[in-house]
């Protein structure tokens, strides 16, 4: 009788998407392996910015107790120099093509015409063309998470670009990519927005005003991590953390690694010998495939 009950429970869990081969595979990914792979991805980021390609001016550092003050304490933009050569690299160009595909207000339905879907495919493929992207796939493949690169790419596409409703539960107005890398406005405030490339683009367009920072990581080369306060097109962000100077493929890879192996949890990584926590969130109100969850958010944890 006990065996029958266990079998029935297992079948129920499988049908609800709570128990599948992916869960079993991820049980074999240790914290030490995540830290080791994150160091490898860090070293393989050949498209990261160099000191001559990127120069920032963080200016005013404030205590975490003052992040909500909304005061502009930095008269100059955050980004002083960004090399056009850096931004013309294939993964950067593919990433930049995606940034104007979204409506910032939640509640406004996102349309995805065929050319925008092609841009999604292009960015993912450009990422897989890098040694960094290949290393991430090879690791997950070795753990039995994905059987082929095409399966991996298809899952990344749904995970990051699949649409869901962040407003009324009906309007498909958001995606993980939009929230994390482009940013959204919800409840009169900036939500998401964890990409330095998007930050720079908006500063250059004159629609983003950098206020201050409350955290500056220990790294002396790029990528670094900043926790920032800023105003985006009239809306305030109390604390927006982001990698600064990493390539777009590194952003995608490190967040994907943490989301796939530690979904909805704090994920401990190691970059250049320094420890860092990355927080991911699952979007639990809708799913794709066999009960898989879209990525809701991901960002570096800053005090």
Swiss-Prot record:
Active site, UniProt feature: 179, 194, 237
SUPFAM superfamilies membership: EndoU-like
Chief localisation class: secreted
Subcellular compartments: Secreted
Cofactor dependency: Mn(2+)
Signal peptide: 1-19
Protein name: Uridylate-specific endoribonuclease A
């Amino acid at each position: 009788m006990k065996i029958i009950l266990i079998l029935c429970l297992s079948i129920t869990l499988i049908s609800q998407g709570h128990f599948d081969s992916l869960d079993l595979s991820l049980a074999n990914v240790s914290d030490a392996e995540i830290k080791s792979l994150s160091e490898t991805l860090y070293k393989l980021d050949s498209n990261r910015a160099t000191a001559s390609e990127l120069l920032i001016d963080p200016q005013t550092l404030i205590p975490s107790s003052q992040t909500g003050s909304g005061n502009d304490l930095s008269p100059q933009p955050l980004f002083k120099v960004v090399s056009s050569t850096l931004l013309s690299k294939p993964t950067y160009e593919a990433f930049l093509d995606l940034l104007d595909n979204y409506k910032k207000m939640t509640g406004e339905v996102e349309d995805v015409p065929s050319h925008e879907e092609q841009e999604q495919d292009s960015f993912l493929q450009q990422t897989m063309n890098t040694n960094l992207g290949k290393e991430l796939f090879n690791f997950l493949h070795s753990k039995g998470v994905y059987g082929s690169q095409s399966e991996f790419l298809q899952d990344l596409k749904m995970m990051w670009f699949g649409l869901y409703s962040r407003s009324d539960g009906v309007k498909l107005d958001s995606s993980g990519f939009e929230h994390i890398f482009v940013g959204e406005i919800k409840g009169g405030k900036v939500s998401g927005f964890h990409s330095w490339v998007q930050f720079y683009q908006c500063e250059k367009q004159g629609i983003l005003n950098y206020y201050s920072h409350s955290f500056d990581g220990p790294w002396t080369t790029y990528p670094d991590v900043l926790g920032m306060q800023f105003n985006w097109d009239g809306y305030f962000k109390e604390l927006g953390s982001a990698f600064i100077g990493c390539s777009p493929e590194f952003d995608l890879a490190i967040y994907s690694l943490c989301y796939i192996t530690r979904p909805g949890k704090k994920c401990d990584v190691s970059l250049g010998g320094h420890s860092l926590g990355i927080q991911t969130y699952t979007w639990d109100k809708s799913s794709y495939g066999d009960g898989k969850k879209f990525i809701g958010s991901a960002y570096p944890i800053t005090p």
